[in-house]
């Protein structure tokens, strides 16, 4: 079995466990994204995960676990790294618009190449520090995964949404200490415990809004 076939098998089994349906084209885009990440990773050190099969679990399936919970049409993924979770979510939601923000040029170059190679029309990679970035219009969702504490995320990103916008943070263990540190200007509107196929460890989603 080729690595491409192995990745496809892991993906299909993961999608089934997550009760998600993606087209053959979307599945192929996700496999190709992992293969591209693995290729670039050897030279540019985009992620500490070295095994492409582990990338499929720890990066792709972990990102796709958000799919049932993602609302809004105009989404920014801050501190996205090589495009996580924004790139897999953009593949899953071709009708939504995604801005993928990172301050490191090598990551943004990789994302730009990925967008071109995968034929994605709904992704805009941007190189910038989050506090220096301003969208043309307020975003519906500010999304983060392994980016910063909730307090820092809200401080740096509050200008990216209006009163209706939401902040959505993907965390490991339930971040009780971080929640207690959140400014009085924001409130936690919802939390969700996620199960990611083949991934050991806790995963939680935290929604926050301006008061």
From Swiss-Prot:
Enzyme class: transferase
Reaction(s) this enzyme catalyzes, per UniProt: guanosine(527) in 16S rRNA + S-adenosyl-L-methionine = N(7)-methylguanosine(527) in 16S rRNA + S-adenosyl-L-homocysteine
GO CC annotation terms, alphabetical: cytosol
Keywords: Cytoplasm, Methyltransferase, rRNA processing, S-adenosyl-L-methionine, Transferase
Keyword match Cell division: no
Signal peptide bounds: none
CDD domains: AdoMet_MTases (cd02440)
One annotated GO molecular function: rRNA (guanine-N7-)-methyltransferase activity
Binding residue positions for S-adenosyl-L-methionine: 79, 84, 130-131, 145
Subcellular location: Cytoplasm
EC number: 2.1.1.170
Pfam families assigned to the protein according to its UniProt record, in alphabetical order: GidB (PF02527)
Function comment: Specifically methylates the N7 position of guanine in position 527 of 16S rRNA.
PANTHER family xrefs: S-ADENOSYL-L-METHIONINE-DEPENDENT METHYLTRANSFERASES SUPERFAMILY PROTEIN
Similarity comment text for this entry: Belongs to the methyltransferase superfamily. RNA methyltransferase RsmG family.
Name recorded for this polypeptide: Ribosomal RNA small subunit methyltransferase G
Organism: Alteromonas mediterranea (strain DSM 17117 / CIP 110805 / LMG 28347 / Deep ecotype)
